[in-house]
From Swiss-Prot:
This is Ribosome-binding factor A. The gene is rbfA. Keywords: Cytoplasm, Ribosome biogenesis. InterPro entries: KH_dom-like_a/b, RbfA, RbfA_dom_sf. Coiled coil: none annotated. It comes from Burkholderia mallei (strain ATCC 23344). GO terms for cellular component: cytosol. One of its GO terms (biological process) is maturation of SSU-rRNA. It holds the Pfam family RBFA.
Length: 122
């Protein structure tokens, strides 16, 4: 007997819904002062929906403190998601700071430096 697998499209839809719901729940329900203005950038689900990597950026506070506070609130957020989502398994949440912006700025800076060096050599 074959196991029923969820489609990749369904996985994306559920991840998007979790992203939207978490954004709202963090803003309205989480009262930890270490969590300032947070943006949920993306959510990656395992195929069995058991775990979700939640990538965020923070405008206030340090990324480490914010990550610690979000992971501390993960159980509460999981329970709130369970009430909102209509799926059999609500994933365990694992929050990670999204370093994409910092890496892009650093890469851009390196490109600018390389171009400036090349211009001086010409």
């Amino acid at each position: 007997m074959s196991k029923k697998r969820s489609s990749p499209n369904r996985n994306v839809q559920i991840a998007d819904q979790i992203q939207r719901d978490l954004s709202e729940l963090i803003m309205r329900e989480v009262k930890d002062p270490r969590i300032g203005i947070v943006t949920i950038q993306s959510v990656e689900l395992t195929p069995d929906y058991a775990h979700a990597k939640v990538y965020f950026t923070a405008l206030t506070g340090t990324p480490a403190d914010t990550q610690e506070a979000l992971n501390h609130a993960a159980g509460h957020l999981h329970n709130l998601l369970f009430k909102r989502l209509h799926i059999h398994t609500v994933p365990t949440l694992h929050f990670h700071y999204d370093q994409t912006i910092e890496k892009a700025v650093a890469m851009s800076r390196l490109i600018d430096e390389a171009n400036a060096t090349r211009a001086k050599d010409d």
